[in-house]
């Protein structure tokens, strides 16, 4: 029982330690990407339109 408990705690600890960085990085990048993608997409479209109209 003690061994299984140790393994469980270690696994949980390892997962917790390993996931935060990935999770934070992923969520941050996803959120940033989503927000910027919507804004940048609109901006890119406007820029392309302006460039085309200017050209």
From Swiss-Prot:
Entry similarity comment: Belongs to the nuclear transition protein 1 family.
InterPro entries in the cross-refs: Nuclear_transition_prot1 (IPR001319), Nuclear_transition_prot1_CS (IPR020062)
Bias-annotated ranges (Basic residues): 1-42
Keywords, sorted A to Z: Chromosome, Developmental protein, Differentiation, DNA-binding, Nucleosome core, Nucleus, Phosphoprotein, Spermatogenesis
Keyword Phosphoprotein among UniProt keywords: yes
Superkingdom of source: Eukaryota
PANTHER family: SPERMATID NUCLEAR TRANSITION PROTEIN 1
Protein name: Spermatid nuclear transition protein 1
Any Pfam family matching the protein: TP1
Record-level GO BP terms: chromatin remodeling; flagellated sperm motility; heterochromatin formation; negative regulation of DNA-templated transcription; nucleosome disassembly; positive regulation of protein processing; sexual reproduction; single strand break repair
One function term, GO molecular function aspect: DNA binding
């Amino acid at each position: 029982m003690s061994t299984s408990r140790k393994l469980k705690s270690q696994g949980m600890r390892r997962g917790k330690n390993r996931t935060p960085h990935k999770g934070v990085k992923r969520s941050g990048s996803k959120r940033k990407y989503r927000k910027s993608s919507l804004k940048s997409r609109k901006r890119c479209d406007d820029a392309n339109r302006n460039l085309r109209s200017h050209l």
